[in-house]
Amino acid sequence: MRAILAGGGTGGHVIPALAIAQELKNVHGAEVIFIGTQRGIETRLVPAAGFSLKLVKVGALNRVSFSTRIKTMFDLPKAILESRRIIREFKPDVMIGVGGYASGPAMLAARLCRVPTVIFEPNIYPGFANRLVAPFAAAAAVHFQETCKHFRQCTVTGVPVRQAFFNLPQRRADGRRNLLVFGGSQGARAINNAIVEALPQLYAAIPGLHIVHQTGEKEYETVARAYLDPLVAAEVSPFIDDMPRAFAEADLVICRSGASTVAEITAAAKPAIFIPLPTAADDHQRKNAEALVDAGAAKLIPQSELNAERLVSEVCELLGNSTSLEGMSAAARKLSHPNAAAEIATMAVGVAGKTKRAARV
């Protein structure tokens, strides 16, 4: 069997796609390649994982300037033709579109070549590329039940995350209250600024508070200076290499609400305060966060309302109430999907097999 995974751009698209690819390769013996763009994180992550990456030239259509949209419209036919060439050379049995720049043209090319397609949509509201190809996809794998209204043949599989998030070591009983803060791999200035401003009040209000703070590369030195007080217990770094360990120690997490982060929160069963990125396409981060808030697993602070006072109030309320934290943790655990990669891979294999059987009839 041969499969193409198409799309990328951000870690939220690429990291789950790699988990699906590994499952297809290791469990189903599939030969797998990726279609992406030069501008996405897939150029680094996909080859590093041992998979071939084919590149097409296409940009964004949604939430971009008029000139960028016009340029993308001109690039789109060429990207479809290039994707069709890749498909004809590789001869896949199925294509999985994971959203992002390359997903739309590649999935349209698959339609032209009569290759069956599966959509993977990690966000509660589908991205533009997945909405574009939804009418002809054979199946869709999603994270939230609400997302199914946008697709035919939809299955709630969850988002693949590393198994380590499901198998966290027991939190040690050391009397500390541990707060984990991060804004994604690049950090988040709004979150950094609010935390720095809130530090004196947080440490005064919460005895034994310990903060682990991922700042992002650009703001590390500025943020780290705020933690220089020898009485402040903290670990500050531009990037956390062992995020499962950081999750294991955390009583509460403050973070954005991209699809992968939300999936990791549920896998680790950690209470969270989400601060959605307001510029995210289709406001999907807010919608992701609201799904967990509605389930009782998280709190939400809009970035427009984020300040030191609001942050201190929310953090103190939660860290001062173990019953609330335990309830949020239990609610998050109910939303987790430990077998997501296996379910999506099995779905793709089933779609490919069904098409082959139909062709023989």
Swiss-Prot record:
Any single Pfam family the record assigns to this protein: Glyco_tran_28_C
SUPFAM superfamilies in UniProt: UDP-Glycosyltransferase/glycogen phosphorylase
Enzyme class: transferase
Chain sites annotated for binding UDP-N-acetyl-alpha-D-glucosamine: 10-12, 123, 162, 185, 240, 285
Covalent S-S links between cysteines: none
Biological processes, Gene Ontology terms: carbohydrate metabolic process; cell division; cell wall organization; lipid glycosylation; peptidoglycan biosynthetic process; regulation of cell shape
Localization: Cell inner membrane
A GO molecular-function annotation: undecaprenyldiphospho-muramoylpentapeptide beta-N-acetylglucosaminyltransferase activity
GO CC terms in record: plasma membrane
Entry coiled-coil feature ranges: none
Superkingdom of origin organism: Bacteria
Catalytic reaction(s) noted: di-trans,octa-cis-undecaprenyl diphospho-N-acetyl-alpha-D-muramoyl-L-alanyl-D-glutamyl-meso-2,6-diaminopimeloyl-D-alanyl-D-alanine + UDP-N-acetyl-alpha-D-glucosamine = di-trans,octa-cis-undecaprenyl diphospho-[N-acetyl-alpha-D-glucosaminyl-(1->4)]-N-acetyl-alpha-D-muramoyl-L-alanyl-D-glutamyl-meso-2,6-diaminopimeloyl-D-alanyl-D-alanine + UDP + H(+)
EC number: 2.4.1.227
Membrane topology: Peripheral membrane protein
CDD domains, alphabetized: GT28_MurG
Main location as per UniProt: membrane
HAMAP family hit by this protein: MurG (MF_00033)
Role: Cell wall formation. Catalyzes the transfer of a GlcNAc subunit on undecaprenyl-pyrophosphoryl-MurNAc-pentapeptide (lipid intermediate I) to form undecaprenyl-pyrophosphoryl-MurNAc-(pentapeptide)GlcNAc (lipid intermediate II).
Family affiliation: Belongs to the glycosyltransferase 28 family. MurG subfamily.
Protein name: UDP-N-acetylglucosamine--N-acetylmuramyl-(pentapeptide) pyrophosphoryl-undecaprenol N-acetylglucosamine transferase
Organism: Koribacter versatilis (strain Ellin345)
Gene: murG
